C-alpha cells in the first residue's frame, strides 16, 4: 500500500546548513572504488551481479526479468509517470542501467530511453545488448553528476536495485539533485533505496549500501527540490520513493 510522505515546506535553515557542509573527504575514494568494483563484477559475470536470481542467464531470460521489473514498477504506475503524455512521446532516464536489463524493457514502452552507469564495462555490455534499438542510449557517468547528458530534459526518471549498493548517502543525494536538474517541472523520479537500518554497512562496501530512514528520505527530497509524495517498503531493502519535481 502506498502512503503519502509528510514534509515541511520551508527548510531554508536546513538547506543553508547543508550547503555549508563540506563533502566527506573519502567521497572520491568511494567513487573510484565503486567504479573499480563494478567493472570487476561486470567482467566476472555482469548479468549475475545485476540480478542475482540466476548465475547463468540466457539472453531471453535476462531481458524478460527486466520486463517483469517494468511490469511491476512502471506499467502499474503510468498515471503518475505519464501525466497525460503519450509514452512514445516521452524521454526517460534510467540511473544505473547495468547491462541493459531494464533499459531494454523501458525502450519497448517509451519514445527515448537514456541509461547511465558508473561502470565502463557495464556500459559496454549494455551498448551491445541495445544495439538494435536506435532510441536507447547508454553513457558512463562519473558518479558525481550527470553532465555527460548535456542539456537533455527528461519526462520521467527511474532506478531499481542500484542505490541499494551505494555506500554513501551523499553520493545518492548527488544523483537525486542531478536528476532534479534534468527533469521537466512536475515530472516523477521513482527509485528504490536501501531502507533496512538493521544491516551492518561500511563506507568501503559497494554491495550493501547506506540505508535511508523515512525522515532522511523526506529531508533529501526537500533539499533537492522534490515533493516526496509517496513511499513503499520503509525499513526494508526495497524502500521505494516517489519524488515529484517542484
Q: Which role fits each region the language model picked out?
A:
Residues 10-146, 169-170, 188-246:
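Class I (Rossmann-like) S-adenosyl-L-methionine-dependent methyltransferase catalytic domain
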Residues 156-170:
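A short SAM/SAH-binding and catalytic strip from SAM-dependent methyltransferases
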Residues 124, 160-164, 177:
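Internal, well-ordered alpha-helical scaffold/interface segments
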Residues 147-157:
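A short acidic, Gly/Pro-enriched loop at the edge of an enzyme's catalytic core
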Amino acid at each position: 500500500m502506498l502512503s503519502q510522505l509528510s514534509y515541511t515546506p520551508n527548510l531554508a535553515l536546513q538547506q543553508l546548513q547543508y550547503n555549508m557542509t563540506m563533502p566527506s573527504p573519502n567521497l572520491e575514494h568511494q567513487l573510484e572504488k565503486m567504479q573499480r568494483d563494478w567493472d570487476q563484477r561486470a567482467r566476472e559475470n555482469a548479468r549475475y551481479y545485476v540480478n542475482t536470481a540466476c548465475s547463468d542467464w540466457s539472453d531471453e531470460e535476462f531481458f524478460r526479468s527486466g520486463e517483469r521489473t517494468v511490469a511491476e514498477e512502471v506499467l502499474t504506475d503510468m498515471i503518475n509517470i505519464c501525466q497525460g503524455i503519450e509514452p512514445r512521446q516521452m524521454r526517460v532516464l534510467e540511473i544505473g542501467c547495468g547491462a541493459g536489463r531494464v533499459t531494454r524493457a523501458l525502450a519497448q514502452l517509451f519514445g527515448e530511453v537514456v541509461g547511465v552507469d558508473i561502470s565502463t564495462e557495464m556500459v559496454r555490455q549494455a551498448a551491445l545488448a541495445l544495439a538494435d534499438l536506435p532510441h536507447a542510449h547508454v553513457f558512463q557517468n562519473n558518479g558525481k553528476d550527470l553532465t555527460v547528458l548535456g542539456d537533455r530534459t527528461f519526462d520521467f526518471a527511474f532506478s531499481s536495485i542500484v542505490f541499494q549498493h551505494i555506500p554513501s548517502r551523499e553520493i545518492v543525494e548527488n544523483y537525486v539533485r542531478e536528476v532534479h536538474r534534468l527533469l521537466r517541472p512536475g515530472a516523477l523520479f521513482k527509485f528504490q533505496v536501501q531502507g533496512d537500518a538493521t544491516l551492518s554497512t561500511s563506507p568501503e562496501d559497494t554491495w550493501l549500501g547506506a540505508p535511508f530512514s523515512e525522515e532522511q528520505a523526506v529531508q533529501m527530497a526537500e533539499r533537492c527540490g522534490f515533493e516526496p509524495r509517496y513511499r513503499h517498503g520503509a525499513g526494508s531493502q526495497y524502500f521505494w520513493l516517489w519524488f515529484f519535481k517542484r
